Curated annotation (Swiss-Prot):
<keyword id="KW-0456">Lyase</keyword>
<dbReference type="GO" id="GO:0006782">
    <property type="term" value="P:protoporphyrinogen IX biosynthetic process"/>
</dbReference>
<feature type="binding site">
    <location>
        <position position="76"/>
    </location>
    <ligand>
        <name>substrate</name>
    </ligand>
</feature>
<feature type="binding site">
    <location>
        <position position="208"/>
    </location>
    <ligand>
        <name>substrate</name>
    </ligand>
</feature>
<keyword id="KW-0627">Porphyrin biosynthesis</keyword>
<comment type="function">
    <text>Catalyzes the decarboxylation of four acetate groups of uroporphyrinogen-III to yield coproporphyrinogen-III.</text>
</comment>
<dbReference type="InterPro" id="IPR000257">
    <property type="entry name" value="Uroporphyrinogen_deCOase"/>
</dbReference>
<keyword id="KW-0210">Decarboxylase</keyword>
<feature type="site" description="Transition state stabilizer">
    <location>
        <position position="76"/>
    </location>
</feature>
<dbReference type="GO" id="GO:0004853">
    <property type="term" value="F:uroporphyrinogen decarboxylase activity"/>
</dbReference>
<feature type="binding site">
    <location>
        <position position="153"/>
    </location>
    <ligand>
        <name>substrate</name>
    </ligand>
</feature>
<dbReference type="InterPro" id="IPR006361">
    <property type="entry name" value="Uroporphyrinogen_deCO2ase_HemE"/>
</dbReference>
<feature type="binding site">
    <location>
        <begin position="26"/>
        <end position="30"/>
    </location>
    <ligand>
        <name>substrate</name>
    </ligand>
</feature>
<protein>
    <recommendedName>
        <fullName>Uroporphyrinogen decarboxylase</fullName>
        <ecNumber>4.1.1.37</ecNumber>
    </recommendedName>
</protein>
<dbReference type="GO" id="GO:0005737">
    <property type="term" value="C:cytoplasm"/>
</dbReference>
<keyword id="KW-0963">Cytoplasm</keyword>
<comment type="pathway">
    <text>Porphyrin-containing compound metabolism; protoporphyrin-IX biosynthesis; coproporphyrinogen-III from 5-aminolevulinate: step 4/4.</text>
</comment>
Length: 346
């Protein structure tokens, strides 16, 4: 097995590679016509992400189109919630809606422990099929939402601009919030282990809303629970690389490095040279390219990729965007991103 590792997995493990691997967050999705056509036939997001045949088909769409070095499970960070007794729906124009927001002790105490093999068997099926069919031509990636971000959704009840409800809980009833975060950390750790057992070779933790916290509050409500998830995973799978992504992470990069993750995925608001100085050498870096550059012309895309890579040539690096690819991105520009990325050499 050691001789036949796919490129992204090799790079994530710190092995010598000839070029940086390339994939994109949200590489399966609305910018692709083939996805939009499928969405017309299956308008429910939950059906698309929870029906194993559909999730598999969507996960593979960018692989067939662009041959990225990573194939990521098509799912959602909220997908494990029903297995804990929290129902949700995703409305196309509004995003996620939690049917019964979690705001009391009795609600938190009544949450179920997540049993992924029972409530998320479809995820296992998809990852197993991806691993078999991708056949090490690319690395299969799994992912989860981090405890703080999941808590933000379930307390607020939906996406939020200022997170006043969860911050009110954090500063008025911190014990209540810690109880919820702890429940999520244990469940998400188990869910990641299930994904790895099912076929994920690298996993990514999305703490999308941790960038809304001050550094001192990150140390209380986000960092420790990210670390708890990583510790649970590493206890059983010490050699599976874990990536951590936070949107708006410039103020907490050093703190992210203390969570036990192997790779930090950067948004585009931080200078990558500066980030290299702030992140220990043994930790890899992913991303940093502004997804907005994909609305430019081909030359500007190539120049930005070259500029980013030249600043980080001496580090373990995975080429990616600093956020998910945006709806409306021209598919040919995504093609340019992948094609040019594969021409880079160490």
């Amino acid at each position: 097995m050691g001789e036949n590792l796919p490129l992204l997995l090799s790079a994530a493990l710190g092995k010598k590679v000839t070029r940086p691997p390339v994939w994109m967050m949200r590489q399966a999705g609305r910018y692709m016509k083939i996805y939009r056509d499928l969405r017309e036939r299956y308008p429910s997001f939950r059906e698309r992400s929870e029906n194993p045949e559909l999730s598999y088909e969507i996960s593979m769409q960018p692989f067939h189109a662009f041959k990225p070095d990573g194939v990521i499970l098509f799912s959602d960070i909220l997908t494990p919630l029903p297995g804990m007794g929290i129902n949700f729906e995703i409305i196309e124009s509004k995003g996620p809606i939690i049917e019964d927001p979690i705001r009391t002790l009795s609600q938190i105490e009544s949450l179920k422990e997540l049993n992924p093999s029972e409530s998320l068997s479809f995820v296992g099926q998809v990852l197993s099929s991806l691993k078999k069919d991708v056949n090490n031509e690319a690395t299969v990636l799994g992912f989860v939402g981090a405890p703080w971000t999941l808590a933000a959704y379930v307390v607020e009840g939906k996406s939020s601009k200022n997170y006043s409800l969860i911050k009110s809980m954090a500063f008025k009833e911190p014990d209540l919030l810690h109880k919820l975060l702890d429940h999520f950390a244990k469940s998400i750790g188990e869910y990641l282990k299930f994904q790895i057992k099912s076929g994920a070779q690298v996993v990514q933790i999305f703490d999308s809303w941790a960038g809304q916290l001050s550094p001192q509050d990150y140390d209380i409500f986000a960092g420790p629970y990210q670390k708890k998830v990583v510790d649970i995973v590493k206890e059983e799978y010490p050699d599976t690389p874990v990536i951590l992504y936070i949107s708006g992470s410039a103020g907490v990069i050093e703190r992210m490095a203390k969570t036990g993750v192997d790779i930090i995925s950067l948004d585009w608001t931080v200078d990558i040279e500066e980030a290299c100085k702030r992140i220990p050498d043994e930790i890899g870096i992913q991303g940093n390219v502004d997804p907005g550059i994909l609305f430019g012309n081909k030359e500007s895309i190539k120049e930005r990729i070259d500029d980013t890579f030249n600043k980080i040539k001496d580090r373990k690096y995975i080429l990616n965007l600093g956020h998910g690819i945006l709806p409306g991105t021209p598919e040919e520009n995504a093609q340019t991103f992948f094609e040019h990325g594969k021409k880079l050499t160490y």
